[in-house]
Amino acid sequence: GLWSTIKQKGKEAAIAAAKAAGKAALNAASEAL
């Protein structure tokens, strides 16, 4: 249904945001070295 689609999109967005945050943290850490 519509609600499960919304939940799926939200989960995908959360995963994408977490990956982006992790990548940014890695970049910041490598530049700090």
Curated annotation (Swiss-Prot):
It is found in: Secreted. GO terms for biological process: defense response to bacterium. Keywords: Amidation, Amphibian defense peptide, Antibiotic, Antimicrobial, Secreted. GO terms for cellular component: extracellular region. Expressed by the skin glands. Its main location: secreted. The modification Leucine amide is found at L33. Disulfide bonds: none annotated. Has antiparasitic activity against trypomastigote form of T.cruzi (IC(50)=0.25 uM) in vitro but not against L.infantum. Probably acts by permeabilizing cell membranes. In vitro, shows no cytotoxicity against macrophages. Has antibacterial activity. Belongs to the frog skin active peptide (FSAP) family. Dermaseptin subfamily. This is Dermaseptin-4.
